[in-house]
Amino acid sequence: LIVPPCINKFYVLDLQPENSFVRHAVEQGFSVFLVSWRNPLASDTDGIDTATWEDYLQEGVLAAVQVVQDISRHERINALGFCVGGTLLASALALAHARGDHPVESLTLLTTLLDFEETGVLDVFVDETHAQARERQLGHGGLMSGRELATTFSFLRPSELVWNYVVGNYLQGQSPPAFDLLFWNSDGTNLPGPF
């Protein structure tokens, strides 16, 4: 089971045949299951805009674990989490463990933040004041746009992901080269505010 970040699309580990982790895993004999997170829209009327972290754990990760167990007929599965997908996966497995369930044989985490005491460069964008303002704005429902999330993450590496394109595209009139990872990075999803 691969749990990708819910702030981007699922295909980050399956961009093209020549650089696909999914393809490699299948070629090694693994049955691969990949979570595709829902992209909540403002027009949705089913309450997705009020979904919480706990909802993503229970109805997302733990439901996916159960599906993989059922289809594979294995009580314990291998799981890989990427970015915030890894944070969700680790949280879900901690919840399962607290309930006496141990559904995973092996756990692999890629670029996953688990200790939020020292968040590094993220502190530039998120501090307690900012978090409280977002809570007031979106804590009871609504969506944080994927575009806003992508812009924030681009500014974590402004030289490569912002100014390079300002100079090349705007000032020099160049077209940016096609690059699968940049396409994926700009193909974001919205998040429910309470999440």
Predicted regions: what is each one?
Residues 50-72:
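Alpha/beta-hydrolase active-site loop
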Residues 65-85:
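Alpha/beta-hydrolase fold nucleophile elbow
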Residues 70, 74, 88, 92-194:
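Alpha/beta-hydrolase-fold enzymes
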Residues 1-43:
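Short, surface-exposed "cap/lid" segments of acyl-processing enzymes
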Residues 2, 34, 78-81, 88, ...:
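Structured core elements
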Residues 2, 23-24, 86-90, 100:
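Non-catalytic peripheral regions of nucleotide-handling enzymes
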Residues 13, 44-52, 90-93, 118-122:
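Short acidic, glycine/serine/threonine-rich loops at helix termini
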Residues 5-8, 37-40, 63, 84-85, ...:
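Short, glycine-/Ser/Thr-/acidic-enriched flexible segments
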